[in-house]
Amino acid sequence: MAKKKAPAPTAAELKDLAQRLETLLRLRTLPIGMRHFDDEASFDAVPGLRRPKPGRHFSTCQLVTQARVAGLTVGIRHENVRPWSNCGGVIGLNAPSDDYLSGRKMAGVWFADLKNARLHQAQMPRVTPGRHIGLVVSPLRSARLDPPDICLFYGTPGQTILFVNGLQHGRYKRYDMSITGESACADSWGRALATRKTSISIPCYAERRYGGVADDEMLVACPPDEFRRGVEGLEALSKVGLRYPIPPYGANMDPAEGMDVSYGAGGKRSA
């Protein structure tokens, strides 16, 4: 008989999981959640909601940074991001204008010609526009999104691979990264919001310039049930000594002594 799927974690459970993840991986900034809203009443009812000042336009990555660094719960509408841009387009709050979709905005900047700039736009993951009126970003520790659509955290490559190892511990699956290039938020929260699949990406130039993403940071976005599986898997790995930070063994040492502890003498673990 197939194993019954556990119910999705609640906001309270995700708060606890986020705290455990911070301890396990020693994260620099807060794990966050994102949730789409389809009506103004439920959007405005989110506890502690902050809205950008009217007339000010941000990149989505700037507003995400306000949540993960300052701990704010931020409500995002189309009028809060650059008008008819990919910022709103990636999260489904607008369709990008023809200036973007045609490639004119990025031709001669990120791409040599209009053809390649247009291909970049055509292949970019996006949430279908017209379904949602807003998106709220909030730290998981605040438990204000019950539940979020996706959970996210920024980590170093070492932290990221250990989280993937945690995801694979109890249910193996091969994970792929996608890289759009510039506008790589499409590969993280854009793809995860659109597909509800775990998405791993390297933040782009704009995320680092405007959103303040550190040079060594990657971004993981996943549905709440995968977030739980990753944290629980990390805890299981910790029990067998596979923890963060990863202690370097030394390039001039025989690895057998270390590997034998994990895998058994001669590379074979005893039954």
Q: Which positions does each model-derived feature cover?
A:
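Acidic, serine/proline-rich low-complexity intrinsically disordered regions
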Residues: 3-271
